[in-house]
């Protein structure tokens, strides 16, 4: 057995599972973004289908709800001509006590080729990837607080689309870092692509102490965090993951860390504003910014389909044995 081999890559260094942006070589990240650029044009055509996954079965296994992420994966798979199956796990065998690996084994017996997995436990997609047959691929659609690699990739794609050269950019990520798998994926991706400066911005209770070890500049004041920024990524306040008194109130949060048109003037004049969604208007971001000229939030959602098409087509085209 090879020492510390990246479980996402085969022996030839090709991507066979997408579990995390962390540890992916820069050339693979760039290849995904380049492939996504080709698929953006497919999504603009009258006939939006390509036959790359014809005859393949894609199972969306969402142990945690997310209508939008699941829908974009479903659209992406269908545009690649795959057969798509959505499993509402909360109402199926898993709720009756069947173990995660039993569920996977049973679905594998139905000739699954690709599992898209969202799970509240960090590491669940890794566990599945270790136990599937060599021809089966796993894509992490979000695991606990750990990672959300396709959201990270679509954020990178959006930044590259509007700003081109990462080595010249200052990117501020603002909000609830403590619970955000998107923030972690964005940070790993930005650092991999050579971003000049990444700032983690938020109150002390929501920006973990270990953030600085990831190579980011930690800022506990919004004004300092977004001053001179080229890109601002606003994060949703994740009330469903919060326990204890991390915040006094959403009104207080908006006063200190909510992005308003006035505060946005501290950033570069051509700065873009992003948000992975869903948006809490009036909590982390003002409606005038969401709907304003510097917002790229809607195009960001559209790019998600092309990025997920790219990931699925790349992993499904590579065999685990390296053939």
UniProtKB/Swiss-Prot annotation:
Keywords: Pyrimidine biosynthesis, Transferase
Subunit text: Heterododecamer (2C3:3R2) of six catalytic PyrB chains organized as two trimers (C3), and six regulatory PyrI chains organized as three dimers (R2).
One record GO biological process: 'de novo' pyrimidine nucleobase biosynthetic process
Disulphides: none
Pathway(s): Pyrimidine metabolism; UMP biosynthesis via de novo pathway; (S)-dihydroorotate from bicarbonate: step 2/3
The protein's enzyme class: transferase
InterPro entries in the cross-refs: Asp/Orn_carbamoyltranf_P-bd (IPR006132), Asp/Orn_carbamoylTrfase (IPR006130), Asp/Orn_carbamoylTrfase_sf (IPR036901), Asp_carbamoyltransf (IPR002082), Asp_carbamoyltransf_Asp/Orn-bd (IPR006131)
Function summary: Catalyzes the condensation of carbamoyl phosphate and aspartate to form carbamoyl aspartate and inorganic phosphate, the committed step in the de novo pyrimidine nucleotide biosynthesis pathway.
Name this protein carries in UniProt: Aspartate carbamoyltransferase catalytic subunit
Gene: pyrB
Record Pfam families: OTCace (PF00185), OTCace_N (PF02729)
Residues reported in the UniProt entry to bind L-aspartate: 96, 181, 236
Chain positions recorded as carbamoyl phosphate binding sites: 68-69, 118, 148, 151, 277-278
Gene Ontology CC: one annotated term: cytosol
Similarity comment text for this entry: Belongs to the aspartate/ornithine carbamoyltransferase superfamily. ATCase family.
UniProt-recorded Gene Ontology molecular function terms: amino acid binding; aspartate carbamoyltransferase activity
Catalytic activity: carbamoyl phosphate + L-aspartate = N-carbamoyl-L-aspartate + phosphate + H(+)
Enzyme nomenclature, EC number: 2.1.3.2
